[in-house]
Amino acid sequence: KEPGFSVSIALVAKDGTPNIGVVFDPITDTLYHAAKGIGAFKNNNPWKIKPANEHLTYVTDRKLKDTPHAAEIESLLHQQVKKLGLKGITEMAGGGSVLNGIRVLENGPACMLKLPKKEDGGGSLWDFAATACIFQELGLPATNFAGRRLDLNRKDGTFMNQEGVFYAN
């Protein structure tokens, strides 16, 4: 058991819509799940998200300073801080894409983003399918970098690098 590790499973429709998403954090023994049209749950209780921080939490797998295009990302984050009237940015680095999606939900206002890139990587569709369903049921964005629905049933591969990823709370 390593912090940031999780187990997830999802059911995705042929059109790429996430219909069921389940995430388990073995470190905290916490279960998150959602089903399309039914809602989102944390440890089997209906889950309501209430962003309470005075800062924007940037959730990432590696520190911003070690990220390609760090200046571009930092600029985007500062724009959001200003737009939302927040006091600054707090970085939460480490962990896999699945739990980082959950961290966005639990540390709002928060975001996780992966810029589009040409080379493979940036997580695979199975890294995002379960949390995309949970976000969908909470009415929060889990989109590609252009703001469109994630393509979770790609025919040309599993990596999400071509469209990027954006999660927000």
Show which residues each predicted segment covers.
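DPxDG-like acidic metal-binding loop motif
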Residues: K1-F41
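Short, flexible active-site-adjacent loop segments at beta-strand->alpha-helix junctions, enriched
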Residues: G37-I38, P46, L64
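Short capping micro-motif at the N-terminus of alpha-helices
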Residues: G21, A34, I49-K50, L152
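Residue-level detection of beta-strand-connecting loop/turn positions
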Residues: N43-N44, G147
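An extended, acidic
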Residues: K50-N169
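Short hydrophobic/aromatic-rich beta-strand segments that constitute the beta-sheet cores
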Residues: A40-N43, T60
